[in-house]
Amino acid sequence: MADDWESAADSEVVIRPTAAASVNKWEGEDEDEDIKDSWEDEEEKKDEEKPTKTEAPAKPKPNKALKAKLEQQARLEEEAEAQRVASLSPAEKLAEKLRLQKIQEASDLKHAQEAFGVTSTCGGLDAFNPESKEEFKEFGATLSWKVAQFRESEHFPQFVEDLVRSLCVNLSAADIKKVKMNVEILHSEKLKLEKANAKKPAGKGKGKVTLRTENDDIDGYQKYGNDFTEDYDDFM
């Protein structure tokens, strides 16, 4: 009987299949999204790293009409100036020549000041502070050049005489003697030159004889008036 029960119990045992592990159908979806996002980020970075092409500004085309107009205006001004000069009287032409000469002298003075380091026109000669022998030569050359601009005045000879006297007051007797000797030598040379020029017949095409001093080499910027300023360079 006991064997029958055991057999019946064994026959009633049912072996059920093991339940399959639950599978999440959304599993791995997040990973796909992460991969997709990383691709998009890389694409954005590549787009940012690409150099942006800047278009070069278009070069302005030359205005041919304006250029031609300016050239025509300049040509008309030159023609008008030529006609004006041609219509001047001899006296007016001389005055015009003197005016242009003064302009040139002013330009030469400006270049001389720049060469000597005098950049401020307000300071003028006061801007000089000579200490060495060469600096005093430069100062004297500039001073004599400036003074010589007034050589056409009838008061110029008296002015020079007074200037020399006032300068010599500050010298010793020995130094004044040296100045006197230089002036006498200069006076003698001037007499010889004046006599030589007076004896030469006019119209021979030879230039006037002038006195040359060492300052002509030192002060090459003096385009005008060397024959006047050299009279005073040796003792100024």
Swiss-Prot record:
One Gene Ontology MF term: translation initiation factor activity
Domain of life: Eukaryota
Region (Disordered): 1-88
GO annotation (BP), single: regulation of translational initiation
InterPro entries: eIF3-like_dom_sf, eIF3j
Recorded GO CC terms: eukaryotic 43S preinitiation complex; eukaryotic 48S preinitiation complex; eukaryotic translation initiation factor 3 complex
Main subcellular location of this protein, as a coarse class: cytoplasm
Subcellular location(s) per record: Cytoplasm
Keyword Protein biosynthesis carried by entry: yes
Cytoplasm in keyword set: yes
Keyword terms of this UniProt record: Cytoplasm, Initiation factor, Protein biosynthesis
Bias-annotated ranges (Acidic residues): 28-46
Biased composition (Basic and acidic residues): 47-58, 68-77
Function statement: Component of the eukaryotic translation initiation factor 3 (eIF-3) complex, which is involved in protein synthesis of a specialized repertoire of mRNAs and, together with other initiation factors, stimulates binding of mRNA and methionyl-tRNAi to the 40S ribosome. The eIF-3 complex specifically targets and initiates translation of a subset of mRNAs involved in cell proliferation.
Subunit structure: Component of the eukaryotic translation initiation factor 3 (eIF-3) complex. The eIF-3 complex interacts with pix.
Family: Belongs to the eIF-3 subunit J family.
Protein name per UniProt: Eukaryotic translation initiation factor 3 subunit J
UniProt organism field: Drosophila erecta (Fruit fly)
Gene behind this protein: eIF3j
